[in-house]
Structure formats: C-alpha cells, structure tokens
Amino acid sequence: MSYSVNFKFNPKRRLVLQAMAGAGLGAAFGGLGIGHVQAAGKKVTMGFLYVGPRDDYGYNQSHFEGKSALAKQSWIKAVDQENVPETIAVQKAMESMINLDGAQVIFPTSFGYFDPHILKIAPKYPDVMFLHCGGLYDASKHPKNVGSYFGYIDEAVYVSGIVAGHMSKTGKLGYIAAIPIPQVLRNINSFTMAARSVNPKITVQVVFTGGWSNPVKEAESANSLIDQGVDVLTCHVDSPKVVMETAEKRGIYSCGYHVDQSRLAPKGFLTGAEWSWSKVYLDYATMISKGTKIPNLIRGGFKEGLVKSSPYGKAVTAKARAHADEVRAQFMKGDFVVYQGPIKDNTGKEVIPKGKGYAQTDIWLESMDWLVEGVVGRTKG
C-alpha cells in the first residue's frame, strides 16, 4: 500500500491537510481522463517550468507535450518557461508565474528544482500548489502545499527490454545513463531483467555520463559501446537525441526514452518508454477547478495511463511484438511483478530472496542502490 496525503485546494483559502492511506492514481483521480470535459467550476491557471528546451526530444518535451494537450480546454490557462537552470532563477520564474500570470498551481518539472527552490518558495504562497515531478515529497517534513507525481516508467522500459532481447544478435546491450540515482538504477535493472527473460546470456553494459545533459559524452559513450559489440542501445538522459542518432548512424538498433524518437532512427528504432503527462495535468486541473481533494503523492504506470510504449519500429519481429504485448497486457491488469525473488545483484549478492516480491507501489524500490545480475558496470567509482 502506498501512502498519500490529501489536501483541498481553494484559491481563496489556505490549504487544508488530511492524512490518509492512498490506493493509487486511479482512485485518486476518480477515473478522469484526457477526454474529460470540466463541469461547473473555476478557471485554472497552471505554470510549467523546464530545465531544458521544449523540443529536446526528451524529458522536457514530454512535459511540454503534456502541457500542450491542455490547449483544447478553454477553462485552462497554461503558461510555461523553458531553459530554467536549477538555481535561484527557478525561484524567480515561479514567483513571476504566480504574481504576473496568476498561477494557482506550479509544475517545476526538474529533479533539482525541489530542494532548496520549491521548499523555499512554497511557504511564501500557501494558496498555491507546487507539484514536483519526482519522488522527493515527504509528508512528515515538507510544506502542506507541496506534492509530487511520477510514473512507473520502468514498466515501459521493461517492455523495451523484451523487444531488445529478441532483436539482439550479439547478446550485448548498451545503456547510457546520467547518474546512479534509484530511478535510473530501477530502469537499468528492469530493462536488463526483461532482456534476460528472453535470453539469460544477455549482458547490459552501462556507462554513467555524470550529468543529465552531456551530448559530447553521450556520443562518445555510444560509439565506445558499439565498438565493443553492443547492437542495441538505450539510455536515461534528458535528451536521447544524440544516442538515437548515433545508433542509427552506426547501423544498430535503439530503444527510446521520454517521448517517441522514431523519427530520429527510422531504420533501427525498435520501441521506447514514454511518459503520458497529458492525463495527469488535465486531471489535476479538474480537481483544482472543482475544489476537490488532491493527493500530495501520485504514482501510476500503464494501468493508470501515466506511461506508454512507443509504436514498434519496422524491424521488430512478430515474435518480439507478441511477447511485449503480452507483458504489457499483464501490467495493464496489475498482474505483473518485475521485482520478484530470487534476484541477485551483479556482485552475486542476493538482494531479493525467493518468495519475496515488491509491487510497483512499494517504497523500497525507490531507494534502489544496486545493479542486477547481467549488468556490466558499477554504481560507484
């Protein structure tokens, strides 16, 4: 069971906090969806901040696409700002949206926006909600008008791993990642276990670039992995553009991340793990407009509509598609458990014993600090 803290939003009153056990995104949103038409309620002004450009073919673009989907709703005013660094600049940008645009809710989408920036600004504006994309919210110590939302993107990454496992001829996959934080490690491990469910001899070689956006090092890492025999590349960086283009240029397969990158690699693109923020943002807006209670902590995967897979590339075989579709269907029903023991890390240590399993909602998974068996790489040094 996950734990959520709910509060009721009213632009003319302070937020009221209620602690309660949360059943998950679907229950929290009460079945609302992107096609939902708002009933009688107040207009909503929402502000979005991105650490990079809106069209980066990656993380920032995924949020921009979610924001752009709101344009069809006349009762929502959405403002945004791109290329906002994780400095005091984000504080100024948030205050500008509140004071000049009248924003009632702010979505600071970058990991580094949370501490100290959101935590410093939120107490100054108790009638404004600050909803951070990530897993940093803690009800025991953070302001009442702060919350977080995130998707179980590793479900879609797992599906990509199945496809990669079917399509690899060398049995060597490559993963270019930014830094070894729990969410990144969870994606790497899910991808690896999925690929090895197809072929237990597969290995996944990981390179950490040390930063979310380092195109030079990303290109160097991609070429190095390909030179070592890797024939499928994927990544967890802010913009996968360089990795996808390098893989295509070198004639190998690729799996995307954040948004659909098939246009970057028309021959070698297999599939990808995508965010689906449009539903989240519309559902938040609807709840704010109606003054209904909003969970401080939101999580969801395929079943809740927060993540999706990119369409298959032309090269993907019927067998790979069928296997991936089958597992995705199990995720949709809530029947598939990725982290089911026995599982060993890549040093041979048992990290999850036989008979023990962790549901996606288990907080233990959000503190992951190990790499699974089959990964070539280290979390430190």
Identify what each model region corresponds to.
Residues 1-30, 37:
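N-terminal secretory signal peptides
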Residues 139-165, 175-180, 266-279:
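Short beta-strand elements at the ligand-binding edges of bilobed clamshell
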Residues 45-66, 70, 79-90, 110-111, ...:
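Extracytoplasmic "Venus flytrap"
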Residues 123-150, 259-267:
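Flexible loop/hinge segments that line or gate small-molecule binding clefts
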Residues 102-111, 131-133, 228-238, 256-257:
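Periplasmic-binding protein-like
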Residues 290-381:
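Segments of small-molecule ligand-sensing domains
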Residues 78-97, 210-226:
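Structural motif
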Residues 67, 156-206, 297-318:
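An alpha-beta-alpha
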